[in-house]
UniProtKB/Swiss-Prot annotation:
Keyword Transmembrane helix set for record: yes
Record-stated family: Belongs to the ST7 family.
Keywords carried by this UniProt record: Glycoprotein, Membrane, Phosphoprotein, Transmembrane, Transmembrane helix
GO cellular component: membrane
Protein name per the record: Suppressor of tumorigenicity 7 protein
CDD domains given in the database record: ST7
Annotated compartments: Membrane
Disulfide bond annotation, renumbered to this chain: none
Species this chain originates from: Cavia porcellus
Length: 584
């Protein structure tokens, strides 16, 4: 009984839905009936005659003005559409049509779609969020010794405010803790990391170091008749040395000296906090801060050694650091190690590092993907020839190299243009967006020399990298080896990269058809209005001639013959059969 009642209710509901779907036809006939009934009270016939009389009295100048006004409005719409497309990457009218008009006109219900596809899209949404995350550049330069020198020479600012603000947030996260207010020097540095003015930050760092040089006297009564004053030094402030090395030092050698002083102070603080970390949450947070400071100092010292040409020393320091702190993956020290090993041409060691970090469970980067492609290209690039490959086909090793290049290009399609020097390089930012133009600049800035060193590697890349796009015709919707390409990269890269750099956009955005159609229609109507206003008689003769041509019998016969000939060409009918066909 219950099942019968449920079935009846479902049928009743479907009938109501069906009736509402076609109810507009009933309303249409009702309106027509009301107009017919009320034609006399509303004086519809008189109004129609008045309108026809008004239209008959209009002059050609009115139509010219009307055409010009419509052209002006179309031009304004075109300008607005073009501005909206340049700013947001989509057509305003198309977006309104899809988002608002389509549901009103019987489009697909968004709720049902979301409920059906929520499970399938959850992973891709999480991946999209993670790929749109901004990461700290593991190969970032030194502000004082490198970025500021570029500004002095060119007068351009290589870093954006957004990028420097992210660095300030990183410094506050890595180098501060809740107990800093208990130590005067750390309290000063906590404020220094928030300063926007570089000179104010440097002055605060010097002030923090001066406070640590004040000696505290502790009175110790050793003999009853005398008093001995013991002089005790406060511990040095490691973060102050870090700030001075990053921003005040004008050369890498000066920065290295300051980092060595920071290492002495940071190592002492780390050992003391390591012994007290289990005494409470406050000591644990302080030990975590001291660990971050020590790792940062050692990593920057290794980078100084790499800059100064002591590459083997830098490799040893990086390996020791990765062994001592294996869980601190936020600094991505393995990418610094890969670059240094490539400089030494230790390709076997590079392969060993890739075997550990090029794992499906670990986040990818341009350094990982393109270094793997470089190693596979190195095995075949010296003998690779496009002509020979087209004749005999690709060997197994060449196929592996091409697949590795396609994998790397799919992950970050902006890198090949910089490696092939199709776009000019700039100084890399302090933060990068994975799969974006900022990551491509950061990778190519340091790895272009390694690709040039391998004979034929750039030639192989030049011949094969564009083939990736045939495998992923719709990269924003579906990828091949990775998730679909995130659509947020362009906006984030414009915030990270300086204004004088032309941001690389992938995939290339084509103008929507509506904008092109509006532009053509606007231009055509404006031209007709101008010609009609200047030469009214000539345009009238031309319009009459065109109407006569289109309405003539010869034009209709020619159009029919052209259609028949086109159909016969598509069907490939032989000449004999064609003549027989026309005879029949």
């Amino acid at each position: 009984m219950a099942e019968a009642a449920t079935g009846f209710l479902e049928q009743l509901k479907s009938c109501i839905v069906w009736s509402w779907t076609y109810l507009w036809t009933v309303w249409f006939f009702i309106v027509l009936f009301l107009v017919y009934i009320l034609r006399v009270p509303l004086k519809i016939n008189d109004n129609l005659s008045t309108v026809s009389m008004f239209l008959n009295t209009l002059t050609p100048k009115f139509y010219v003005a009307l055409t010009g006004t419509s052209s002006l409005i179309s031009g304004l719409i075109l300008i607005f559409e073009w501005w909206y497309f340049r700013k947001y990457g989509t057509s305003f009218i198309e977006q309104v049509s899809v988002s608002h008009l389509r549901p009103l006109l019987g489009g697909v219900d968004n709720n049902s779609n979301n409920s059906n596809s929520s499970n399938g899209d959850s992973d891709s949404n999480r991946q999209s969020v993670s790929e749109c995350k901004v990461w700290r550049n593991p190969l970032n330069l030194f502000r004082g010794a490198e970025y500021n020198r570029y500004t002095w020479v060119t007068g351009r600012e290589p870093l954006t405010y957004y990028d420097m603000n992210l660095s300030a947030q990183d410094h506050q996260t890595f180098f501060t803790c809740d107990s800093d207010h208990l130590r005067p020097a750390d309290a000063i540095m906590q404020k220094a990391w928030r300063e926007r003015n570089p000179q104010a930050r440097i002055s605060a760092a010097h002030e923090a170091l001066e406070i640590n040089e004040i000696r505290s006297r502790v009175e110790v009564p050793l003999i009853a008749s005398s008093t001995i004053w013991e002089i005790k030094l406060l511990p040095k402030c490691a973060t102050a040395y870090i700030l001075l090395a990053e921003e005040e030092a004008t050369t890498i050698a000066e920065a290295e000296k300051l980092f060595k002083q920071a290492l002495k102070a940071g190592d002492g603080c780390y050992r003391r906090s390591q012994q007290l970390q289990h005494h409470g949450s406050q000591y644990e947070a302080q030990h975590r801060r001291d660990t971050n400071v020590l790792v940062y100092i050692k990593r920057r010292l290794a980078m100084c050694a790499r800059r100064l040409g002591r590459t083997r020393e830098a490799v040893k320091m990086m390996r020791d650091l990765m062994k001592e702190f294996p869980l601190l993956s936020m600094f991505n020290i393995h990418e610094n190690l890969l670059e240094a090993l490539l400089e030494l041409q230790a390709y076997a060691d590079v392969q060993a590092v890739l075997a550990k970090y090029d794992d499906i469970s670990l986040p990818k980067s341009a350094t990982i993907c393109y270094t793997a492609a470089l190693l596979k290209a190195r095995a075949v690039s010296d003998k690779f020839s496009p002509e020979a490959a087209s004749r005999r086909g690709l060997s197994t090793a060449e196929m592996n190299a091409v697949e590795a290049i396609h994998r790397a290009v799919e992950f970050n399609p902006h890198v090949p243009k910089y490696l092939l020097e199709m776009k000019s390089l700039i100084l890399p930012p302090e933060h990068i967006l994975k799969r974006g133009d900022s990551e491509a600049i950061a990778y190519a800035f340091f790895h272009l020399a390694h690709w040039k060193r391998v004979e034929g590697a750039l030639n192989l890349l030049h011949c094969t990298w564009e083939g990736t796009f045939r495998m992923i015709p719709y990269p924003l919707e579906k990828g091949h080896l990775f998730y679909p390409y995130p659509i947020c990269t362009e906006t984030a890269d414009r915030e990270l990269l300086p204004s004088f750099h032309e941001v690389s956009v992938y995939p290339k955005k084509e103008l929507p058809f509506f904008i092109l159609f509006t532009a053509g229609l606007c231009s055509f109507t404006a031209m007709l209005a101008l010609l009609t206003h200047q030469f009214p008689e000539l345009m009238g003769v031309f319009a009459k001639a065109m109407i006569d041509i289109f309405c003539s019998a010869e034009f209709r016969d020619w159009n029919c013959k052209s259609i028949v000939m086109r159909v016969e060409d598509e069907l490939e009918i032989p000449p004999a059969s064609q003549s027989q066909h026309f005879q029949n």
